[in-house]
């Protein structure tokens, strides 16, 4: 999905003998809307894109063959929550689900974020979040954010401003504050040093994409790596909790280097996986999210 580009227009308006030249002005750029749930596309209505969360996912898995590989960097949080929405009466829900993943993560330290809920437990000296089990407190949080973010009210899915407004209201009502900083770089890359600083500080991020990819798994064999991947043509939001860079070598030469964000899919099945950078995507924004 391409980012909409609207050009300014220089208009000449005539009223009989009166001639008025209008100043060059840019029409307001409509906000992208985010709503993919494993099926995604966008429709053009005139010149303005709208995202309705319906359509197709394209398989984009690939193989890499090499003499050897190195993990250049592997920066990630040990454990995070990953929820999905199983309620068919709330379609196009990736934004409220991403918001629920964020508040679910910080609920460990801010226990009123999800009322009557314990997000995880200490296991062998490490805190582990419980898997998604469609518990009522989580379902209630998704539904609350769905309403606060006005999902599907002003169009299919949720815009960035609706997401931020709804999440801020939810966090404030729970007695906490939300802040955020950008780690966006361009349409296919994020600022990895900024993300690394955030992850090392125990924070999570968020990516907002007009088109995206999701990697279900990276399987390494002897001299061979398989990447199980799909590309989606619709707006999508995912929580981010780290990144991994892999360099491949043949005959002593580094011929390919791939970087992946660790992400929560936001799909109904609540998978965790990756999003490949410098690949099929249109990253509109990337934010480090903090609740305190």
Task: Name what the model sees in each region.
Residues 19, 61-65, 70, 177-179, ...:
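Ser/Thr- (and often Asn-) enriched beta-sheet segments in non-cytosolic proteins
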Residues 3, 87, 92-95, 160, ...:
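Active-site-proximal structural scaffolding
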Residues 1-18:
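Sec-dependent N-terminal signal peptides of Gram-positive bacterial secreted proteins and lipoproteins
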Residues 135, 139-141, 145, 150-200, ...:
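Flexible, surface-exposed loop/gating regions in the mature catalytic domains
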Residues 20-160:
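Active-site-adjacent structural segments surrounding the nucleophilic cysteine of cysteine proteases
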Residues 93-104, 179-182, 204-209, 239, ...:
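Structural recognition of the beta-strand scaffold that forms the well-ordered cores
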Residues 191-193, 198-202, 208-292:
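Active-site signature of cysteine proteases
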Residues 89-92, 100-101, 110, 150-159, ...:
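Solvent-exposed loop/turn segments at secondary-structure junctions
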């Amino acid at each position: 999905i391409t980012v909409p580009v609207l050009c300014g227009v220089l208009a000449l308006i005539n009223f009989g003998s009166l001639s008025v030249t209008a100043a060059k002005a840019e029409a307001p750029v409509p906000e992208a809307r985010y709503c993919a749930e494993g099926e995604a596309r966008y429709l053009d209505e005139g010149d303005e894109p709208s995202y309705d969360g319906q359509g197709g996912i394209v398989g984009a898995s690939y193989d890499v063959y090499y003499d050897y590989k190195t993990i250049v960097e592997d920066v990630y949080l040990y454990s995070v929550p990953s929820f999905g929405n199983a309620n068919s009466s709330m379609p196009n829900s990736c934004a409220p689900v991403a918001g629920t993943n964020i508040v679910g993560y910080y609920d460990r330290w801010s226990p009123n974020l999800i009322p009557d809920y314990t997000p995880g437990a200490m296991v062998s000296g490490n805190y582990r979040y419980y898997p998604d089990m469609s518990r009522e407190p989580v379902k209630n949080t998704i539904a609350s954010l769905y309403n606060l973010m006005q999902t599907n009210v002003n169009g299919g899915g949720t815009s960035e401003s609706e997401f931020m407004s709804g999440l801020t209201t939810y966090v404030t009502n729970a007695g906490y504050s939300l802040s955020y900083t950008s780690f966006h770089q361009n349409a296919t890359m994020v600022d990895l040093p900024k993300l690394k600083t955030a992850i090392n500080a125990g924070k999570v991020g968020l990516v907002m994409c007009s088109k995206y990819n999701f990697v279900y798994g990276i399987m390494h064999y002897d001299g061979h790596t398989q990447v199980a991947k799909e590309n989606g043509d619709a707006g999508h939001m995912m929580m981010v909790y780290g990144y991994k860079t892999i360099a491949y070598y043949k005959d002593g030469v580094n011929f390919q280097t791939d970087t992946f964000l660790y992400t929560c899919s936001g799909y109904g099945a609540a998978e965790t996986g990756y999003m490949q950078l410098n690949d099929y995507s249109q990253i509109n924004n990337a934010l480090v999210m903090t609740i305190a």
